[in-house]
Amino acid sequence: MNAVTDLKQDYIVADIGLAGWGRKEIAIAETEMPGLMAIRDEFAAAQPLKGARIAGSLHMTIQTAVLIETLKALGADVRWASCNIFSTQDHAAAAIAASGTPVFAFKGESLKEYWDFTHRIFDWADGGTPNMILDDGGDATLLLHLGARAEKDASLIAKPTSEEETFLFAAIKEKLAKDSTWYSRNLAAIRGVTEETTTGVHRLYQMAQKGELKFPAINVNDSVTKSKFDNLYGCRESLVDGIKRATDVMIAGKIAVVAGYGDVGKGSAQALRALSAQVWVTEIDPICALQAAMEGYRVVTMDYAAEHGDIFVTCTGNYHVITHDHMAKMKDQAIVCNIGHFDNEIDIASVEKYEWDEIKPQVDHVKFPDGKKIIILAKGRLVNLGCATGHPSYVMSSSFANQTIAQIELWAERDSGKYPVGVYVLPKHLDEKVARLQLRKLNAQLTELTEQQAAYIGVKKEGPYKADHYRY
């Protein structure tokens, strides 16, 4: 990739000439994102994000372009990088760069470039720092926290345990050699973060439990209108899109093994069954396993499924769910992919020693010593974004409406004391607001409670209608 970097411009993209194409697709996406566009229209005059300088680390797609332009329309200053080396849509990045927003992203970044670009979102052109983070997976948040700790204890970045850590640690060392307090200065300036996905939320809760988190965070992922829609319905459409674009495989009749039966796994299993695959599920949680069984899926272990499955999809957010030994047992031409945030759900490092033959970008044959080949998609990273274009605009509207509301909330309350350091979720009435805005596009008609009915079930007529502990 010969990325375009103009020293007179504050961006790095694949081809700025793609901006026109990107702008046309952004215009189409806006018509499919009613919730986000309604938030833009509602708050534009008030400029609730005026003064906010947002460092964004989230997949640089067409839908994200609509989010970025919403944040700017509400008064924010924004710099952006993708949170995945394969997920950028180059025409989207070009359109945003051409509009004057600094963006550092192209499809197929190296890990070195990835961490370089993540650093760039914190380097404001005027020499200042950001004061907010919008994160997906937690890498931007991790970078500042780890870097600040490494300023005091270099041993923290002395012994990487993975390829990802090798490049992360090297990037931190390089930055510290130039500016020994860069991380702590940036960290001190951040007033809050809003986190998009399950993996990043896990990181935030772990940091909070250890006393390491240095600013308040809103867990956007666990808003109902995010997790029960983006994670489930988004994956239900984008998983198979990625597999089909990559392989053109016939799914009907195949044994498809879905590792993990959370919201992402549920959507993935539904998609594969809709195309008449025989869907097997692996699970550690007896409740999720029981749900899968009651839906008619066969619940098995990966040890058992490895030699039988034709298509494998990891959806757990966990580590080495598919191991070297599992892949060694697989059928010739088995398809292996991941739709969880990071690439370590599949032990890709363990098979790097074998012969890899690139069929096309993000589609590789891996040849084992016995001559068998398996097909690995997107090198174990997100298949729906590596091999396709991710979730549809409509479902991302819910997620990004929540992101925007969360940014407004944290920024508005930055000095009020409402959010001491910790991890929070948006209140129920805002969740319901996003759902109402989304329903407009579907011509849905909501039934209204009478005063008597509202009193009978103990809620306000206008909502919220469910207790915080309610499980949708």
From Swiss-Prot:
NAD(+) binds at residues 197-199, 231, 260-265, 283, 318, 339-341, 384. Substrate binds at T61, D136, E196, K226, D230. GO terms for biological process: L-homocysteine biosynthetic process; one-carbon metabolic process; S-adenosylmethionine cycle. Its main location: cytoplasm. Its cofactor is NAD(+). GO terms for molecular function: adenosylhomocysteinase activity. Binds 1 NAD(+) per subunit. GO terms for cellular component: cytosol. It comes from the Bacteria. It is an enzyme of class 3 (hydrolase). InterPro entries: Adenosylhomocyst_ase-like_sf, Adenosylhomocysteinase-like, Ado_hCys_hydrolase_NAD-bd, NAD(P)-bd_dom_sf, S-Ado-L-homoCys_hydrolase_CS. Pfam families: AdoHcyase, AdoHcyase_NAD. It is found in: Cytoplasm. NCBIfam families: ahcY, PRK05476.2-3. May play a key role in the regulation of the intracellular concentration of adenosylhomocysteine. This is Adenosylhomocysteinase. The gene is ahcY.
